[in-house]
A protein has these predicted regions:
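N-terminal export/assembly segments and adjacent metallocofactor-ligating motifs
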Residues: 1-243, 265, 270, 278, ...
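N-terminal leader/propeptide and maturation segments of large enzyme subunits in energy/redox metabolism
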Residues: 69-89, 236, 241-279, 455-546, ...
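Active-site phosphate/pyrophosphate-binding segments
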Residues: 234, 254-367
């Protein structure tokens, strides 16, 4: 009698999630089945560790609730009633409906809605751009997060990767600003601990005493949306006490006199009244930051999530040049190192296919577009949604749902599970998970090129996004060579493999080793702006932004590579503090006295994994963190179910009384699926569709509510 002994095959991969860490994976396969996913211990950044979100990633692939086949709606929109059809039948229906819409309304009546449910080059943020540009569709501006920060960062220092996260190990003073790193950038923390071991001081600036804040040497608790005022207050002290690196400022910055004049308007006393931080602490923070070199700032995306978020990022990004922090290894700021990668976006997105005068719609305004508020002509008559679950993740979700219910709206959703968004689809196309697809990861938190190789075959009719768009292109009659290229052929054109940063890196080598570091200097030597070399029009750090002359703009990568039809609204060349609209509205505060912020959860990745029972147990049900005094005033006890509401909508959660928030502030994590929640809604039922002052980003943290026992 023979005994079959399974051999484990190990395949190298990369995490696809919307996270700066982009962990190096090892897929363990036995008899064609994925049995385990572990971290690669040899990767210098991620070092073999996986976050709690990925602990059961192998099982995720075999969840019995996965969508495996194309489906067509047979019940009311939102009911989740579908019948199975073949993939070819789905494509035929899409062609029929799109052809009818184009004939009657024109191609701009169709729009793609996509974000970072996957962050690969082939299958991620830009995976549908070329197809929809070729189709002539309305351009959807992808502004869920980072678009405001990108505009602000580029206006100030240009498209630079800035400080290497690994170089934080050499810092002596580290500010983690608006980021709960232990939940959202876990693999950067060991470098901070290494710096701490060598004497560095760790400061966290955050409205909440988060996991990260509790591990810091000093938690500076700030009111939401007032970060720009704090940065100006720090500048005021630095300038008044002559802690400026005048040599660096004279040589490598533009607009110091104007910035100085602006900072003089924000003495610590004024800033204290705005931010809730004491005068003494503002002075202390400024002095320590300026005089303890090398000093570093890790900027979180949450900086942009209020009305003045864009200028807040500009101001925070200006601090390192003011004190000369860029001179040193471990000095400067890191926002999104993606700019170091030599993407060929002209090929990835094919903006040359965009017809002149094509309109744009910010994805955060989709509800207003669908309900007629934007008065679009032609109206939007069809959507294709992929890499996104907007019913959970988009602000002012009730308005979006109202629009998705339109019977005359033809909606196609590519998904892995029957999400709240998929329930409103007319056609569902099943998508692959990472172990089933090939891709070159887009790493936006470190400097490694990482290849993901498929370890198992896709189940059912599931296909990667890149293949879905090939099939759609053939279905719509597109005969361009682009749609005939293999994945490798596409990747060879999607990057400039001859760029200095890619020296020694080849696709064939990546297939052998999985990952390679960009040639941009070793972490212990890297000083990208020690002598200026900023990628701005002046070549300097621009306290006074040259780009402001043309008004507000969204970086083209967030809008299909399109640089026409930009917002263009006026932008102050010197950044200023812009108060939160709702947070500073005294009349609104009487009706809705609680400020609500909705940070990312610890065990979900945005809304991903929120339907997994294991992750639900780890994260727990929806809670609302409330200060004890606010709870007592409303007779709310710890553990009570409470209703959180305003004019836009409401949701329910379990009260968690804590002094981790200050009086007047409540916290409820985003990511929960409305359909799986107690009240059938989630936190984005209460958030507004308003935008921050730059880059079209949202104001999720500028939200006033009231709370009461449910």
């Amino acid at each position: 009698m023979s005994v079959h002994i399974s051999e484990t095959r190990v395949v190298r991969g990369a995490c696809p999630q919307d996270c700066p860490d982009t962990c190096a994976f090892l897929y363990h396969v036995e008899d064609g089945k994925l049995v385990e996913v572990t971290g690669d211990p040899d990767h210098p950044m991620t070092r073999g560790g996986l976050c709690v979100k990925l602990k059961d990633y192998a099982e995720h692939h075999y969840n019995p609730d996965r969508l495996l086949h194309a489906m067509k709606r047979v019940g009311p929109k939102g009911s989740g009633q579908f019948q199975r059809i073949t993939y070819d039948e789905a494509l035929a229906e899409i062609k029929k409906r799109w052809t009818q819409i184009i004939d009657q309304y024109g191609s701009q009546a169709i729009m793609n809605h996509c974000y970072l449910g996957n962050q690969g080059t082939l299958n991620g943020l830009t995976s549908g751009d070329a197809f929809f540009n070729r189709l002539g569709a309305t351009i959807g501006e992808k502004c869920y997060c980072e678009s405001g920060s990108s505009t602000a960062w580029i206006m100030t220092v240009g498209p630079t990767g800035g400080l290497d996260v690994e170089s934080l190990a050499y810092s002596k003073y580290i500010i983690v600003w608006a980021m709960n790193m232990l939940s959202t950038n876990l693999h950067a923390w060991p470098f901070i601990l290494e710096a701490k071991k060598n004497g560095a001081k760790i400061v966290v600036i955050d409205p909440i005493r988060t996991r990260t804040a509790k591990q810091a040497d000093w938690h500076v608790q700030i009111r939401p949306g007032t970060d720009g005022a704090l940065a100006l207050g720090m500048m005021n002290v630095i300038i008044a006490e002559d802690l400026v690196d005048h040599d660096y400022v004279d040589k490598y910055t533009l607009g110091y006199d104007e910035l100085k004049a602006r900072a003089e308007q924000y003495p610590p006393e004024r800033v204290a009244s705005i931010t809730g931080i004491s005068v003494e602490d503002i002075r202390k923070l400024a002095r320590e930051y300026a005089t303890t070199q090398p000093s570093a700032i890790r900027e979180g995306v949450a900086l942009e999530r209020s009305s003045g978020g864009g200028d807040a990022v500009r101001l925070v990004s200006s601090l390192p040049a003011l004190v000369g922090a860029w001179r040193h290894v471990g000095g400067g700021a890191v926002e999104m190192p993606i700019w170091e990668f030599p993407f060929n976006f002209d090929f990835i997105q094919r903006p040359d296919w965009i017809k002149p005068g094509t309109r744009v719609v910010n994805e955060l305004d989709l509800g207003a577009a669908l309900t007629g508020e934007l008065r679009l002509d032609p109206p939007l008559m069809s959507l294709l949604i992929h890499n996104s679950n907007p019913v959970s993740q988009q602000q002012n979700a009730n308005k979006l749902i109202q629009g998705l219910k339109r019977e005359d709206l033809f909606t196609v959703v590519s998904e892995i599970f029957m999400t709240d968004t998929a329930r409103y689809a007319d056609i569902i196309l099943p998508a692959t998970l990472q172990a089933e697809q090939y891709d070159l990861a887009v790493t936006w938190g470190h400097l490694y090129v990482m290849l993901n190789q498929p370890a198992i075959s896709p189940p059912g009719e599931c296909v990667p996004n890149v293949e879905m768009f090939r099939r759609l292109a053939r279905t719509m009659g597109f005969d361009d060579d682009y749609w005939k290229m293999s994945d490798d052929e596409l990747l060879m054109k999607m990057y400039d493999w001859n760029a200095p940063a890619m020296q020694g890196i080849t696709l064939e080598k990546l297939k052998e080793v999985g990952w390679m570091r960009l040639n941009v200097g070793a972490p212990g030597q890297r000083t990208p702006h020690a002598e200026g070399n900023f990628k701005t029009p002046s070549g300097k750090c621009e306290f006074k932004a040259s780009a402001a002359a043309n008004g507000n703009f969204i970086v083209p990568v967030w809008r299909n590579g399109y640089n026409e039809m930009q917002p263009g609204d006026p932008v102050d060349s010197v950044p200023d503090y812009i108060p939160p609209v709702e947070g500073s509205d005294a009349v609104l505060a009487k009706r809705y006295p609680i400020s609500l912020i909705s940070p990312k959860p610890h065990a979900f990745l945005n809304s991903q994994y929120a339907n997994e029972s294991v992750q639900q147990r780890r994260q727990g049900e929806q809670t609302v963190v409330v200060h004890p005094n606010d709870a007592a005033a409303r007779n709310i006890k710890n553990g009570d179910y409470i209703r959180v509401f305003n004019d836009r909508g409401s949701f329910e959660g379990k009260a968690e009384l804590s002094t981790d928030v200050y009086e007047g502030l409540a916290v409820a994590n985003l990511g929960y699926w409305p359909g799986l929640s107690r009240s059938g809604s989630a936190v984005n039922a209460t958030t507004s569709s308003s935008h921050c002052n730059l880059g079209g980003a949202g104001c999720q943290s500028d939200n006033r509510v009231e709370i009461a026992i449910a």
